[in-house]
């Protein structure tokens, strides 16, 4: 163990980083699935038929997010005390902009999907756009649960 105890949180050489990413990606997927949003994991071809790079910038994609538009959610986990984030007031926002939006947003212009980076910090913080997307997913799940409850109540009373 290192003297500060943060090595496991920020080391790029261990499988912990990938495991942490996959667990949070699966959580985002489960939220969308609970809300009956029909999510897909790492959908290939999300950037359209003209994109030959075979990139999959959407860890979780939702085909029917808004009117005639889907949503590609790209999940990332960062450690705010890593050297690349020190001195940044909002590491999640900075990472979302430089590593996700700047890299992928232009590719979505001719796609049927919008793009939303959901960036978690190992300390628990979340970028603003990610928070908005997750709140919308929770609201969808809550609405779905409420409708199911009403349906079950009607079934019992008849």
What is the predicted role of each segment?
Residues 1-24:
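Short Cys/His-based metal-binding microdomains
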Residues 15, 87-95:
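Short, contiguous acidic/charged loop-to-helix segments that flank catalytic cores in large enzymes
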Residues 41-47, 113-124:
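Acidic carboxylate-rich catalytic motifs and surrounding loops in phosphoryl-/glycosyl-chemistry enzymes
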């Amino acid at each position: 163990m290192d003297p500060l105890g943060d090595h496991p949180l920020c080391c790029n050489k261990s499988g912990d980083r990938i495991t942490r990413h996959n667990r949070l990606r699966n959580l985002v997927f489960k939220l969308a699935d609970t809300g009956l949003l029909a999510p897909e994991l790492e959908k290939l071809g999300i950037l359209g038929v003209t994109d030959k790079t075979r990139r999959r910038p959407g860890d979780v994609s939702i085909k029917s997010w808004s009117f005639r538009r889907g949503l590609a959610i790209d999940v990332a986990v960062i450690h705010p005390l890593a050297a690349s984030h020190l001195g940044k007031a909002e590491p999640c926002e900075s990472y979302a902009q430089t590593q996700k939006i700047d890299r992928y947003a232009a590719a979505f212009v001719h796609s049927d999907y919008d793009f939303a980076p959901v960036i978690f910090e190992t300390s628990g913080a979340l970028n603003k756009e990610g928070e908005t997307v997750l709140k919308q997913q929770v609201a969808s799940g809550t609405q779905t649960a409420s409708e199911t409850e009403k349906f079950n109540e009607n079934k019992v009373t008849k």
